[in-house]
Swiss-Prot record:
Keywords, ordered alphabetically: Cytoplasm
Presence of keyword tRNA processing: no
One Gene Ontology cellular component: cytoplasm
Region (Disordered): 1-21
Name of protein: Cytoplasmic filament protein A
Organism lineage: Bacteria, Pseudomonadati, Spirochaetota, Spirochaetia, Spirochaetales
Subcellular location: Cytoplasm
Function according to Swiss-Prot or TrEMBL: Component of the cytoplasmic filaments that run the length of the organism just underneath the cytoplasmic membrane.
Source organism, top-level taxon: Bacteria
Length: 21
């Protein structure tokens, strides 16, 4: 993911599952 936030990247990139995993 472009924005890797340790808090909750899923919220910023909910359409990109790769950001979470």
């Amino acid at each position: 993911a472009i924005l890797e936030l340790p808090q909750s990247p899923n919220v910023f990139h909910p359409e990109k599952p790769s950001a979470v995993g």
